[in-house]
Amino acid sequence: MKYRLSVFLTLVAGFLLIPMIATAQQSCESLASLKIPHVTITMATAIDPSPDWEAPNPKAPFWSSEPITVSVPFCRVAGFSAPARDSHIGFEVWLPRADHWNEKYLGIGTPGFVGFIAYRALARNIQKGYATASSDTGHVDVDTPGEAPTAEWGAIPDKVIDWGHRGQHETTVAARQISRAYYGKPIKYAYWNSCHEGGNQALTELQRYPEDFDGIVAGDPAHYITHLQSVTEYVTLTLVGDGPDSPGFFPHAKYPVLHRAVLDACDALDGVRDNIIDDPT
């Protein structure tokens, strides 16, 4: 009798648990009311392409003007984090539909000082089944053709910190919580894959917030910023300060000659001639 009763109670508990698990997931639109410390969600919209949905394409350095299209349904969440007085870290989190999700998260960075969401990378990642997110690193550049990005944010300490490391961390923390609310379970593995300043962001994540990711790819990291910027400015002023009239101006037509000379001098240093310089020292 006791055995039958225990089996009955176990079955009842199991049936009661089913709706609890089901309701742990949230609809895309309900994520707009999700509460996360110092985070405001401004949009949560289900995107159902038919056949394709075209994403925004900021006019910024390093950005292609080719249209960005997505062909799989997903939940698009936008918001911002304000962890400090002058912080406003804009971000977007894209979540593939549950039956297309690979249970992984892929964070992505941005090049240089660019203050834009990396929509092209978001589109690429969502097609592969990743929950994915990108931030503007705490500032927004102009979106006017022919105009250079603004730099006023560089005089605001909070925004410099956001660009330097806090923006990516805040975005990752928010993305994890948004993802968990949407799918009703935590991310199995979290990765970072980005290059240039995104590679530098990878290194700062690894150094300051090692708990954010299970694996990190830091492509051509633009680190050692003080030296990097000093050399960049010197080379720019020396080579193109006065355009073609600069004493050190090097015309584009001679680039292939320089490229060949560098390969001839350095390619074999790593033991293999393959047109790739693995050891520039």
Task: Specify the residue positions occupied by each region the protein language model found.
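N-terminal secretory signal peptides that target proteins for export/translocation
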Residues: 1-5
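Glycine-rich nucleophile elbow surrounding the catalytic serine of serine-hydrolase chemistry
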Residues: 195-204
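Catalytic-loop region of hydrolases
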Residues: 23-104, 117-120, 259, 277
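Bacterial N-terminal signal peptides
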Residues: 8-19
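Cap/lid segment of the alpha/beta-hydrolase catalytic domain
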Residues: 102, 107, 111-187, 230-231
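Alpha/beta-hydrolase fold nucleophile elbow
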Residues: 185-196
